Regions:
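Hydrophobic alpha-helical segments within soluble ligand-binding/sensing domains
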Residues: 1, 23, 113-121
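Catalytic, metal-anchored helix/loop core of enzyme active sites in primary metabolism
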Residues: 99-114, 124-125
């Protein structure tokens, strides 16, 4: 909403050194024009093409969601490249970093914490060891700690396709 009211391009960097799941989810939710991720070899040519397409469609206010571990560089390098290619665009940079972990929990956050806490205690009573309780596909599961530490959430390419459609 702020981008629309001020006719600006916002580059928003979120956590995601190794995986772009947060950036992809946030990009989808916000209707971001582009989502720049560590898993994808995003290029400046693609980014600039998205911006040119937005200009051609008279879309003057946009958001570009950036995961911190992307291949284009840090958010300030990306902003500099955009400013060089599009000097008339007012580019603003926001780095959320660990700020995004803060804030008051939502109802869903509280329910999830209660359910996972219940299952953690249930697991202890049942003799589960070296596991954590978590949700996968709306089901509570026990995941080995080793897996929780070493595995990453895989991006759903369909999510990126939907995000691209909604951005136009």
């Amino acid at each position: 909403d702020t981008a629309s009211s001020h006719n600006r391009l916002f580059l928003v960097e979120v956590m995601g050194r190794d995986t772009g799941y947060i950036a992809a989810s946030t990009g989808l939710a916000t209707g971001a024009l582009s989502i720049i991720l560590p898993e994808k070899n995003n290029t400046y040519e693609e980014l600039f093409a998205d911006l040119r397409s937005a200009q051609a469609n008279k879309k003057t206010s946009n958001i570009i969601m950036v995961a911190e571990g992307n291949h284009l560089g840090d958010i300030f390098e990306i902003a500099s490249a955009v400013r060089s290619e599009f000097p008339s665009i007012d580019v603003k940079v926001t780095t959320l970093g660990h700020t995004q972990r803060g804030g008051s929990p939502s109802t869903n956050d509280r329910i999830l914490a209660s359910v996972l806490g219940h299952y953690a205690i249930k697991g202890l009573i049942e003799g589960q060891e070296k596991v954590m309780s978590g949700m996968i596909n709306q089901k509570v599961v026990f995941t080995p700690l080793e897996d929780a530490i070493t595995k990453t959430t895989e991006l759903d390419d369909e999510m990126l396709t939907i995000a691209k459609i909604l951005a136009t």
